[in-house]
């Protein structure tokens, strides 16, 4: 009986196992659907699927639970908020330093990325040595770190004195520095029509609807050139020709010359407005020489006759050579009575001794 019972039990168990097999067969298409989509996955055993009906959902929530875990790791744990402290030191080049808390006197690491409100005039984020700041304390990898660093009551930090400053006029630097106040409409009405440089403002504003700078530049450029160098450009733009003004020194020199040399009165000087102009040197009129005396005129005639008719006068255009030695004067010296003897004539006193010598012989 036991064998029969076993056989029966075995017979009964076989149909039950066969019945269990078709019952386990329907869950097979569910795991095969990913394989049909193209992912090469092996079918899971039926015993696992049948024995743990909740096992289908177990692998699904696993990645969902891992995402919050990663976000929690990214967010650091906040230890304290709105803590006041004094900057112990901060290196601008390396971008980190330490802040000493005022409550616990503990040094907290601070990085330049933790500065929330930087000085707008500074290029790099930084905090100055000895500056009082407000920050949050979070737990970092190696200890306490500062986050959301600002000035007291949330104002921007002062920054380190070693951090580079921004340029004050980056856009339109040259135009804003020497430009007038921004009253473009008034300037266009006042100076647009009477511009001395011939500039005409645009007629229709619709043509430049989107270009704001193109409307600004033509309107206030002409006043710049007039206001930049007012004393120089006013004299140059209206009248660039040289004017003639009477010079006081020349007037005095003219009066003196009229008294002495006969220069006409009212001598004028040509004055230029250009301050760098230097007038050229001009030789004045030749001075009239006084007429020579009668005796001097006769002497000149005698000298010309002695030198010869072809030779030019010795006084005008004569220049002694470099290696010239003075020769003794010819025997045409002036006599005591004031008359000259020519070089060809022999003196009257010399022949007398000659006749005496011949008679003695």
From Swiss-Prot:
Q: Where does the record place the region Disordered? A: 1-73, 173-361
Per its record, what are the GO molecular function terms? Answer: DNA binding; mRNA 3'-UTR binding; nucleic acid binding; ribonucleoprotein complex binding; RNA binding; RNA polymerase II transcription regulatory region sequence-specific DNA binding; single-stranded DNA binding; small GTPase binding
Note the PROSITE patterns from the entry. CSD_1, CSD_2
Cited Gene3D superfamilies: Nucleic acid-binding proteins
- Regions of compositional bias (Polar residues) in chain numbering: 303-313
Superkingdom of the source species: Eukaryota
**What do the Gene Ontology cellular component annotations say?**
bicellular tight junction; cytoplasm; gap junction; nucleus; perinuclear region of cytoplasm; synapse
Keyword terms, alphabetized:
Acetylation, Cytoplasm, DNA-binding, Methylation, Nucleus, Phosphoprotein, Repressor, Transcription, Transcription regulation
User: Which GO BP terms, alphabetically?
Assistant: animal organ regeneration; apoptotic process; cellular hyperosmotic response; cellular response to tumor necrosis factor; ectopic germ cell programmed cell death; fertilization; in utero embryonic development; male gonad development
Q: Phosphoserine: which positions carry it?
A: 2, 33, 52, 126, 193, 195-196, 313, 335, 358-359
**Omega-N-methylarginine: modified positions:** 243, 315
Positions modified as N-acetylserine? 2
Task: Name the InterPro entries for this protein.
Answer: Cold_shock_domain (IPR050181), CSD (IPR011129), CSD_CS (IPR019844), CSP_DNA-bd (IPR002059), NA-bd_OB-fold (IPR012340)
Compartments in which it is found = Cytoplasm; Nucleus
The biased composition feature labelled Low complexity covers 1-23, 33-71
Keyword Transport present in the record's keywords: the answer is no
In which tissues is this gene expressed? Answer: Abundant in the skeletal muscle, spleen and fetal liver.
Q: What is its main location?
A: cytoplasm
Q: Give start and end of each CSD domain.
A: 85-149
Q: What does this protein do?
A: Binds to the GM-CSF promoter. Seems to act as a repressor. Also binds to full-length mRNA and to short RNA sequences containing the consensus site 5'-UCCAUCA-3'. May have a role in translation repression.
What does the record note on quaternary structure? Found in a mRNP complex with YBX2. Interacts with RRP1B.
Q: What is this protein called?
A: Y-box-binding protein 3
Q: Gene encoding this polypeptide? A: Ybx3
């Amino acid at each position: 009986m036991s064998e029969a019972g076993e056989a029966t039990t075995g017979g009964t168990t076989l149909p039950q196992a066969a019945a269990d097999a078709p019952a386990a067969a329907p869950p097979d298409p569910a795991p095969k659907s990913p394989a049909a989509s193209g992912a090469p996955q092996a079918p899971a055993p039926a015993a696992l699927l049948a024995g743990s009906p909740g096992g289908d959902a177990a692998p699904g929530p696993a990645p969902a639970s891992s995402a919050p875990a990663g976000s929690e790791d990214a967010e650091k744990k906040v230890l304290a908020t709105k803590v006041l402290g004094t900057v112990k030191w901060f290196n601008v080049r390396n971008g980190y330093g330490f802040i000493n808390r005022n409550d616990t006197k503990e040094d907290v690491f601070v990085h330049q990325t933790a500065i929330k409100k930087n000085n707008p005039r500074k290029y790099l984020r930084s905090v100055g040595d000895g500056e009082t700041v407000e920050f949050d304390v979070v737990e970092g990898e190696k200890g306490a770190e500062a986050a959301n660093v600002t000035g007291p009551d949330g104002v921007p930090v002062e920054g380190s004195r070693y951090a580079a400053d921004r340029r004050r006029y980056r856009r339109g630097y040259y135009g804003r520095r020497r430009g007038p106040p921004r009253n473009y409409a008034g300037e266009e009405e006042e100076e647009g029509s009477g511009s001395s440089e011939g500039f005409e403002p645009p007629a229709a504003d619709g043509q430049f609807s989107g270009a704001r700078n193109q409307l600004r530049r033509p309107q206030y450029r002409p006043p710049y050139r007039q206001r930049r160098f007012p004393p120089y450009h006013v004299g140059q733009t209206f009248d660039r020709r040289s004017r003639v003004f009477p010079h006081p020194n020349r007037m005095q020199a003219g009066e003196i010359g009229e008294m002495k040399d006969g220069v006409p009165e009212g001598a004028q000087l040509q004055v230029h407005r250009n301050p760098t102009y230097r007038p050229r040197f001009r030789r004045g009129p030749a001075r009239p020489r006084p007429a020579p005396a009668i005796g001097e005129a006769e002497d000149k005639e005698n000298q010309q006759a002695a030198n010869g008719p072809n030779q030019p006068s010795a006084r005008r255009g004569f220049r002694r050579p470099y290696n010239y030695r003075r020769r003794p004067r010819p025997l045409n010296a002036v006599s005591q009575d004031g008359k000259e003897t020519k070089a060809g004539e022999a003196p009257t006193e010399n022949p007398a001794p000659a006749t005496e010598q011949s008679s003695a012989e």
